[in-house]
Amino acid sequence: MRLVIEESKEILTTHAGLYAVGELLRKTKLRSRLNAIRLAGRPEPEISHGDVAVSYIGLLCQGKNDFDHIEAHREDDFFRRAMGVRVVPSSPTLRQQLDEAAGQAGWEAILREESAHLLARKARPTAVTVGGRDLVPLDIDVSPWDNSGTKKEGVSRTYHGYDGYAPIFAFLGVEGFVVHSELRPGKDHSQKGTTKFLRESIIYARSVTGRLLLLRLDAGFDSRDNILICRDARVEFIIKRNLRGESESVWLEWAKRHGSMREPRPGKRVWRGALVCDVEGKPVRMIVEAVERTTRANGQVLLLPEVEVQAWWTSLPDDPDTVIRLYQEHGTMEQFHSEIKTDLDLERLPSGKLATNNLVLQFALLAYNILRLMGQAMFGDPTVPLRKARQRRRIRTVIKDLIYLAARLVVHARQVRLRYGQGNRWGPPLRRICEALA
């Protein structure tokens, strides 16, 4: 049977979930704050800063970052209504206004602040229970992004061995809400500029939750400055030590004398212990783990024992096993990095300018948190087709199942209705999510 393909006069959309995105953005002051800013080269813009910003967030929530993708929505009546914009900008207008605002107009701080305010109203980051206390994890780390083969400003050799950027992120809670981000040249060391970033991250995190924070950092952030910042801010911390060439055999002997031993398998013994060291005249607890292997997991006997030593600074009074377990959970943030890079398709940033790409990253921070809120709103909803219990829904799942939902926009009798197809099992969850987040 041959089908006749033709254009309909009905208003149909493949991205009905953007209505929920628009509803959440209407809970913020993003539009009014951006519209109050006067750019030097555009004091009276034809398309308001708020419309430009909200339109771009609508793109990012579909997993698109290239400015040219906005052209598909310029005559999209549903996109305009859902996002609450008067005019959808063209691709050149979007690019030019972001270039003009980047790094000098304060847009970056506004995006971070409005994102934090939205999380404070709509999110409750999950804590971890440690010694009878609830601590909200604050995980900070760098995630190299591959931009090989480009001549973008700031692209340089990363520690992963390719050319790209080295953005740093601060994730809050078990769910991984982003409270701070910053785009950095690929060659920059993890610690460069981190003291300022760390202070700001703690401020943003505390604007979201009033509970105690547990900061977790890897060995690239082993610095006395970071420890002092945590102590001054009264934040609990676990920071992996960079042993910097210290003798592993010496630490192994110390662990054998002062630590407790367990043998997880024949040929592998693990010692764990704790000691107190002096840092800038103040005592700081250190956890040490030493591993000695005489055989491999497959049973192969080693000619000489293999020794592996790891250590962590911590403010927690708990036993070494608890501290190490909490630090190992820090690795979950690699999943959050992956979602930003792949699910939001952000690794290859759209501009050739470092400042503009950093502004794009702040837009992505807000878009990511909106999608995360939508994913968290699925829990406890009996109409959601997914039944497997999880702590969070992957961003890709939210985009695929909720954002890309087909529907029909009906304007009749002074009412505007969004109708999804009969039998579409994701329609009721979207309706409930909009009601829950309203």
Please tell me what each predicted stretch does.
Residues I70, P320-F363, A367-Q376:
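Short amphipathic alpha-helical "interface-anchor" segments enriched in bulky aromatics
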Residues R206-L213, D232-A233:
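Short, surface-exposed connector motifs at secondary-structure boundaries
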